[in-house]
C-alpha cells in the first residue's frame, strides 16, 4: 500500500505542475500486466479539459520527479496510461519487512469496532453445505477485517422462538430423541417426522400456534421446552463449526429482545412514524417511498411478533455495540434485508452493511432440512477427509496413520473452505469435492503443498547448508525475474487485505493466495536455492523461501485454512 501512497503523492504533484488538480480517488489506479500500478487519470482530465489523453499522459510523466529513496523506480506513459514500476528499494524493504514482522506482516493499524453476524441457521438440525457458505464467507471476512486492523466481534443470532422452533419443541415431546447420535442430527430426525405428521393432520398446526402464543406471553414451562430443544441443536452446530475452524464470539438469543421489552418498544417507534397500517388484522409497515411495493409485517393478527420484528430489535441493540454492523445473508434474504434496512433508516437507527451470497449446491442436487433432503456438513466433511486420507496415503505411504489423519483433516477442511470462498459471493457455485481436493487444480491443497514445500526446503537447508534464519542477508542480490515477481506478489498482501476489507469480498484473498503459490513454485522451478554456488546468493534465496513461507502461512491463516509443515 505504501507503493500506491508514494505513487499518489508523486502523480498529484506532477498534475499540479501541468495546471490541474485532482482528488486521490480520481487517480484511478489499477493493476496491469505492464506495470506494478497504472493510472487512468489522463483519460479523466482529458475528457474534462477537452485534451488529447495520450499527449496529456506524456506531459504529466515529463513533470514527474521521483525523490531519493522512493519505492517508485520508473514512470512511463503507454498511450493514455501512466505506468509505475517499483524500484529496488521497494523490493529490498519488502523482504526486510516480511522477515521482521513475520505473522504480523500485512496487519493494518487499529481501526473501528465491527459487529459481524453470520451463519445464524435455525436450530432445527445439522448445518448443510448451503449454510456453510454463509459460515465460510462470514468467518473469512472477520479474519480479513481483523488483519486489516478492525476490532471485530462475531455473533450468531439464535432463532429460539419461531414457528420452526415450536415444531422442534413439539417434536421432542412427541418422538423419542436418539441421543446416541450427534445432538443436532437427533433434532433433525424428530423435526422431519413432525413435519410429516403436520402435513397429514392439519389439526396439529393449532398446537404449534398455541406453543408460539405461550412463548410470546412468557409461559415458563413452554420456554423451558423450547430452550432444551434449541440447546441440543446449537451444541451440535457448534461442533460442526469448530471442525470447520469457525468460531463465534457470542450467541445471541432472539427471545431476549421480547423479554426485555425491546420488541414492544421498536414496534411503538415504528408506529410513531405514521407508516403502519392494518392488513387483515396484522400490523404492516409501508416502505413504498424506499422502493418496496410489498409491505413489511411486524405483528400478526393475534398480536404476536414475527422473526422480522425481533430482528429489528436485535439490530437496534447491535447499533449501540459497534461503529459498523455487517450481516451475511443468503440470496433468499435479499428482500427482507432491504426492508429491514429501510425500516431502521426510517426510525433513525444505524443500518447494517449486508453481504448477500448466492447459493452453493452439491452435484447431487438441492438441500432442504424440512423434508430431510440434505447432506449435512458433517457428512460432507467426513467424505472429503476420507478422500484426502487416501491421497495422503498414496503420496506418503511411509508416514504414520496419525500423521495421515492430521494432514487429511487439514487438507479436507481446507479444500471445503477454499473452494467455497474462492467464488465471489454474488455468484452461485457447485461444490465438487473431487475437484476441490485435486492437487493440480490449484485449490487449497496446492497452496498448502506450496507452504509445506517451503518448510521442507528450509529444513533441508539447515541440515545441508548450515542455514541460519537469523543471518544477515543482501536482498539486492535477488535479481532474477522469478525472484522479483515473487517479492512483488508478497508485497501485495496488505493491499489485498485492504481491498477485501473495504469491499467485503473475501474471494480476493483466495485468488491472491493461489497466485502467491504460483509465484513461489515458479521461482523454485527456475532458480537454484540450496544448490546456488555463491554463499551470499544462497542465503538471500533461502531468506526469500522463508518470506514466501511466512506470507503463504499468513494468507492461509486469514482464509481459516491450516498451513501444514509436511504433506
UniProtKB/Swiss-Prot annotation:
Keywords: Aminoacyl-tRNA synthetase, ATP-binding, Cytoplasm, Ligase, Nucleotide-binding, Protein biosynthesis. It catalyses: tRNA(Arg) + L-arginine + ATP = L-arginyl-tRNA(Arg) + AMP + diphosphate. It is an enzyme of class 6 (ligase). Its EC number is 6.1.1.19. Signal peptide: none annotated. A motif ('HIGH' region) lies at residues 121-131. One of its GO terms (biological process) is arginyl-tRNA aminoacylation. SUPFAM superfamilies: Anticodon-binding domain of a subclass of class I aminoacyl-tRNA synthetases, Arginyl-tRNA synthetase (ArgRS), N-terminal 'additional' domain, Nucleotidylyl transferase. It is found in: Cytoplasm. InterPro entries: aa-tRNA-synth_I_CS (IPR001412), Arg-tRNA-ligase (IPR001278), Arg-tRNA-synth_N (IPR005148), Arg-tRNA-synth_N_sf (IPR036695), ArgRS_core (IPR035684), DALR_anticod-bd (IPR008909), Rossmann-like_a/b/a_fold (IPR014729), tRNAsynth_Ia_anticodon-bd (IPR009080). One of its GO terms (cellular component) is cytoplasm. One of its GO terms (molecular function) is ATP binding. PROSITE patterns: AA_TRNA_LIGASE_I. Belongs to the class-I aminoacyl-tRNA synthetase family. NCBIfam families: argS. This is Arginine--tRNA ligase. It comes from Methanosarcina acetivorans (strain ATCC 35395 / DSM 2834 / JCM 12185 / C2A).
Amino acid at each position: 500500500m505504501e507503493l500506491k501512497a508514494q505513487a499518489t503523492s508523486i502523480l498529484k504533484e506532477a498534475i499540479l505542475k501541468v495546471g490541474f488538480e485532482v482528488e486521490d480517488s480520481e487517480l484511478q489506479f489499477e493493476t496491469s500486466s505492464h506495470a506494478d500500478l497504472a493510472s487512468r487519470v489522463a483519460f479523466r482530465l482529458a475528457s474534462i479539459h477537452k485534451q488529447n489523453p495520450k499527449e496529456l499522459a506524456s506531459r504529466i510523466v515529463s513533470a514527474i520527479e521521483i525523490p531519493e529513496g522512493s519505492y517508485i523506480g520508473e514512470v512511463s506513459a503507454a498511450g493514455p496510461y501512466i505506468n509505475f514500476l517499483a524500484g529496488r528499494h521497494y523490493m529490498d524493504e519488502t523482504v526486510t519487512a516480511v522477515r521482521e514482522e513475520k505473522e504480523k506482516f500485512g496487519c493494518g493499524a487499529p481501526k473501528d469496532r465491527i459487529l459481524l453476524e453470520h451463519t445464524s441457521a435455525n436450530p432445527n438440525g445439522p448445518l448443510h453445505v448451503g449454510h456453510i457458505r454463509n459460515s465460510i464467507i462470514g468467518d473469512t471476512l472477520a479474519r480479513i477485517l481483523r488483519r486489516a486492523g478492525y476490532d471485530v466481534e462475531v455473533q450468531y443470532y439464535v432463532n429460539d422462538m419461531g414457528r420452526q422452533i415450536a415444531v422442534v419443541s413439539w417434536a421432542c415431546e412427541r418422538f423419542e430423541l436418539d441421543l446416541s447420535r450427534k445432538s443436532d442430527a437427533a433434532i433433525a430426525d424428530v423435526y422431519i417426522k413432525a413435519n410429516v405428521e403436520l402435513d397429514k393432520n392439519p389439526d396439529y398446526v393449532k398446537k404449534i400456534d398455541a406453543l408460539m402464543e405461550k412463548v410470546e406471553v412468557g409461559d415458563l414451562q413452554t420456554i423451558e421446552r423450547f430452550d432444551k430443544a434449541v440447546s441440543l441443536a446449537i451444541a451440535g452446530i457448534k461442533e460442526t463449526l469448530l471442525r470447520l475452524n469457525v468460531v463465534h464470539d457470542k450467541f445471541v438469543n432472539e427471545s431476549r429482545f421480547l423479554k426485555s421489552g425491546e420488541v414492544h418498544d421498536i414496534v411503538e417507534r415504528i408506529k410513531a412514524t405514521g407508516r403502519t397500517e392494518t392488513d387483515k388484522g396484522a400490523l404492516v409497515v409501508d416502505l413504498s417511498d424506499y422502493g418496496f411495493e410489498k409491505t413489511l409485517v411486524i405483528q400478526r393478527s393475534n398480536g404476536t411478533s414475527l422473526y422480522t420484528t425481533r430482528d429489528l430489535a436485535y439490530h437496534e441493540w447491535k447499533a449501540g455495540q459497534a461503529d459498523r454492523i455487517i450481516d451475511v445473508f443468503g440470496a433468499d434474504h435479499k428482500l427482507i434485508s432491504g426492508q429491514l434496512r429501510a425500516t431502521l433508516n426510517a426510525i433513525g437507527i444505524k443500518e447494517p452493511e449486508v453481504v448477500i451470497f448466492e447459493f452453493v449446491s452439491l452435484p447431487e442436487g438441492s438441500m432442504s432440512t424440512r423434508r430431510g433432503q440434505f447432506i449435512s456438513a458433517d457428512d460432507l466433511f467426513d467424505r472429503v477427509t476420507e478422500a484426502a486420507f487416501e491421497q495422503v496415503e498414496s503420496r506418503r505411504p511411509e508416514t504414520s496413520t496419525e500423521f495421515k489423519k492430521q494432514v487429511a483433516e487439514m487438507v479436507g477442511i481446507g479444500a471445503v473452505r477454499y473452494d467455497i470462498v474462492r467464488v465471489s459471493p454474488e455468484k452461485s457455485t457447485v461444490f465438487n469435492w473431487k475437484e476441490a481436493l485435486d492437487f493440480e487444480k490449484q485449490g487449497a491443497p496446492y497452496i498448502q503443498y506450496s507452504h509445506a514445500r517451503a518448510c521442507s526446503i528450509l529444513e533441508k537447508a539447515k541440515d545441508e547448508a548450515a542455514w541460519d534464519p537469523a543471518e544477515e542477508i543482501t536482498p539486492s542480490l535477488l535479481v532474477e525475474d522469478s525472484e522479483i515477481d515473487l517479492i512483488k506478489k508478497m508485497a501485495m498482501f496488505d493491499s489485498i487485505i485492504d481491498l477485501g476489507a473495504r469491499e467485503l469480498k473475501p474471494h480476493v484473498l483466495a485468488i491472491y493466495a493461489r497466485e502467491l503459490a504460483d509465484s513461489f513454485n515458479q521461482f523454485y522451478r527456475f532458480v537454484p536455492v540450496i544448490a546456488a554456488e555463491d554463499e551470499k546468493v544462497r542465503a538471500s534465496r533461502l531468506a526469500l523461501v522463508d518470506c514466501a513461507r511466512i506470507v503463504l502461512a499468513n494468507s492461509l491463516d486469514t482464509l481459516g485454512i491450516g498451513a501444514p509443515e509436511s504433506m
